[in-house]
C-alpha cells in the first residue's frame, strides 16, 4: 500500500525495523493508559509488530494499522488504525507518542485515515470509542466533525480494571476533508 500523506503526518506500513519506535509508544504508560491494552514489554511489542506486518501482507487484510511519521522524518511517532467492521462501517483508532502530544499529529493522522476509509475503502460510517477522561482524543474527533452517540459502560478491560468508553461516529456525507 502506498503511504498516505496529510499536512503534518505521513501514514505508511509498519516495518519490523520500527520496533524501537513502536516500543517507545506501546510501552509507555502515559500512552497506554488511554488504550485498550496494557503497556508492552520488548517481547510483546516485537510479537505485536510482527503480527501487524503479517496482517498488512494479507490480500483481504482485517485492518490497516499504519505507522505515523512526519514528512521530514521517517521515525515512527505514533500509529493509526482503520478496522473495517461490516460491509459499510469501520473503527478508528490512533495513538501518538507522549513526547509528540500537542502538535496536531493525532488530528492530522485521523483526518488522513478518514479520507482513506471514506474514499478507497468505501465506508459509510466510522466510529471511535474513547475513554471519558481522554479529553485530548475527544477533542480530536470533535474537530473532525464526529457526533457523540453514547456511553458504553465497562467497555474495555485494561490496566487491571474495566473502563467505560464514549462512542462517537462520523458518516460519509458529514466528512468535509
Task: Describe the function of each predicted region.
Residues 1-30, 67-177:
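Acyl-donor (CoA/ACP) binding surface of acyl/acetyltransferases
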Residues 14, 42-43, 56, 175:
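A short hydrophobic/aromatic micro-motif that marks alpha-helical segments and, especially, helix-coil
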Residues 17-19, 59-62:
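Short acidic-aromatic low-complexity motifs
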Residues 26, 35, 56-58:
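Hydrophobic residues in alpha-helical segments
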Residues 30-53, 64-66:
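Conserved GNAT-fold acetyl-CoA-binding loop/helix
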Residues 52-56, 155:
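Short, P/G- and charge-enriched loop/turn segments at secondary-structure junctions
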Residues 56-61, 146:
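Short loop/turn motifs at secondary-structure junctions and domain boundaries
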Amino acid at each position: 500500500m502506498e503511504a498516505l500523506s496529510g499536512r503534518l503526518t505521513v501514514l505508511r506500513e509498519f516495518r519490523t525495523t520500527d520496533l524501537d519506535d513502536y516500543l517507545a509508544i506501546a510501552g509507555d504508560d502515559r500512552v497506554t493508559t488511554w488504550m485498550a491494552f496494557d503497556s508492552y514489554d520488548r517481547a510483546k511489542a516485537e510479537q505485536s509488530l510482527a503480527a501487524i506486518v503479517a496482517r498488512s501482507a494479507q490480500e483481504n487484510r482485517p485492518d490497516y494499522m499504519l505507522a505515523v511519521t512526519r514528512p521530514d522524518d521517517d521515525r515512527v511517532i505514533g500509529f493509526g488504525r482503520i478496522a473495517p467492521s461490516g460491509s459499510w462501517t469501520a473503527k478508528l483508532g490512533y495513538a501518538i507518542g507522549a513526547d509528540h502530544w500537542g502538535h496536531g499529529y493525532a488530528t492530522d493522522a485521523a483526518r488522513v485515515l478518514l479520507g482513506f476509509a471514506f474514499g478507497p475503502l468505501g465506508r459509510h460510517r466510522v466510529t471511535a470509542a474513547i475513554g471519558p477522561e481522554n479529553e485530548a482524543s475527544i477533542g480530536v474527533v470533535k474537530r473532525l466533525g464526529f457526533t457523540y452517540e453514547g456511553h458504553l459502560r465497562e467497555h474495555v478491560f485494561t490496566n487491571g480494571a474495566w473502563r467505560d468508553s464514549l462512542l462517537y461516529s462520523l458518516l460519509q456525507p458529514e466528512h468535509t476533508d
